[in-house]
Regions:
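Eukaryotic intrinsically disordered, low-complexity regulatory linkers and tails enriched in Ser/Thr/Pro
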Residues: 1-112
Length: 112
């Protein structure tokens, strides 16, 4: 069985733990984009959420990972404009989205 990791969520951000150690951590303010996609061709393929950070790093969160739901709950309260779960999960599973997945959040750069 593949280790899906564990997502730990706090008020300021989140971390991904795999194999008993922290492999990635970020503040909510450093999240640039969230993209949901399937790893594979079939509808039963694992669903992943690619979290792109401001520095270009992409952290992959597995839907089956403990803490994934807590991540989405906190993200919906913290990231303005995040698409509701129902708007992207069912179309992705049904195969009606593009092969590149669905962007569920994108931070708009502020212009001064």
């Amino acid at each position: 069985m593949t280790d899906t990791g564990r997502v730990v969520v706090v008020a300021a951000g989140f971390a991904l733990w795999t194999g008993g150690r922290c492999v990635a951590a970020s503040r909510w303010a450093d999240v640039r984009r969230l993209r949901a996609y399937l790893r594979g061709e079939s509808a039963d393929s694992p669903l992943l959420l690619g979290v792109e950070l401001l520095d270009g790093t992409i952290v992959e969160l597995h839907e089956a990972a403990p803490g994934f739901d807590a991540f989405l709950d906190r993200a919906s309260a913290t990231l303005p404009g995040l698409l509701p779960f129902a708007a992207w999960h069912a179309p992705l599973r049904a195969g009606t989205s593009s092969t590149e997945g669905i962007v569920v959040f994108e931070r708009v750069a502020r212009r001064y």
